[in-house]
């Protein structure tokens, strides 16, 4: 029991020395019992201290109960998955609430949208701006693996499950992924230094030290760093020229810094030296030992 300064025995809910306690109609302190509150909720008071429980769970007569921050007791639900049909899956926690966001359940890294629906076969944007992809069947976050979303669109999830972007070295291959994470294949990518590289149409590997074509008989050359060359180049002993897009010049002229022109063979792309050539304008021009020719106005 507890008596106040006037000697009155206290009853009902009381706060004494910072502890929330409860005394029944006779004034006896309640311990190890449920109490019905005036607002229709229920609270529970500790069996030893008599203090109202908050932010915890308890088991009484084999039943599990949850206690919130205000001390309101509710019967615990059994956590588990459930479906509403149409392959929509949810997970209810011990309070019976649908979980949302990133969750680790039974060792699986899963994700549930704002409505609680489990994400399967879809991308999710993480808090740091990166993206992750969740398996079509299990819903598990993909980690350290390539995956495709159809239409030959390939991606790679790193060891944290983040979909990579930009230049990457994976299993010894030099690959590139666009800003959405889609792997670049059979296309150019712009490097940080402004140069361009080309990635193989099947493997996605960056082409290095090789000629290649992008179709329509347009030829390019990737140097030892995998950068597409531009301007005048000597490759395998041949004097060649590539325009500012990297396309090899064939059957056409290029203007030199001193105002002279050079001509590059229509078949081999080799610079014309010590010979006459009828250039595309119809004029005949002689190209000297340096491969330079001059056109009269």
Language model segments and positions:
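Extracellular adhesion/carbohydrate-binding repeat motifs centered on closely spaced tryptophans
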Residues: 1-297
């Amino acid at each position: 029991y507890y008596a106040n300064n006037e000697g009155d025995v206290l009853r009902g809910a009381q706060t004494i020395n910072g502890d929330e306690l409860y005394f029944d109609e006779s004034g006896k302190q309640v311990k190890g019992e449920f109490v019905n509150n005036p607002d229709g909720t229920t609270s529970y008071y500790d069996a030893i201290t008599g203090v109202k429980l908050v932010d915890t769970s308890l088991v009484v007569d084999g039943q599990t109960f949850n206690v919130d921050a205000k001390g309101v007791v509710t019967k615990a639900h059994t956590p588990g998955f459930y479906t509403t049909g149409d392959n929509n899956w949810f997970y209810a926690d011990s309070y019976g609430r649908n979980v949302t966001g990133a969750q680790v359940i039974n060792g699986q890294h899963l994700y549930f949208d704002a409505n609680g629906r489990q994400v399967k076969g879809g991308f999710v944007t993480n808090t740091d701006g990166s993206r992750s992809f969740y398996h079509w069947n299990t819903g598990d976050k993909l980690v350290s693996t390539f995956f495709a979303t159809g239409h030959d669109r390939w991606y790679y999830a790193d060891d944290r499950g983040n979909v990579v972007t930009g230049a990457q070295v994976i299993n010894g291959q030099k690959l590139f992924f666009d800003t959405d994470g889609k792997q670049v294949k059979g296309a150019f990518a712009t490097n940080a230094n402004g140069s361009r590289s080309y990635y193989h149409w099947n493997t996605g590997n960056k082409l290095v030290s090789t000629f290649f074509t992008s179709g329509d008989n347009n030829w390019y050359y990737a140097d030892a760093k995998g950068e597409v060359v531009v301007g005048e180049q000597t490759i395998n002993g041949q004097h060649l020229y590539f325009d500012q897009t990297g396309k090899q010049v064939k059957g056409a002229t290029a203007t030199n810094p001193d105002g002279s022109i050079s001509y590059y063979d229509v078949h081999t792309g080799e610079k014309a030296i010590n010979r006459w050539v009828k250039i595309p304008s119809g004029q005949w021009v002689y190209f000297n030992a340096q491969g330079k020719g001059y056109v009269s106005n």
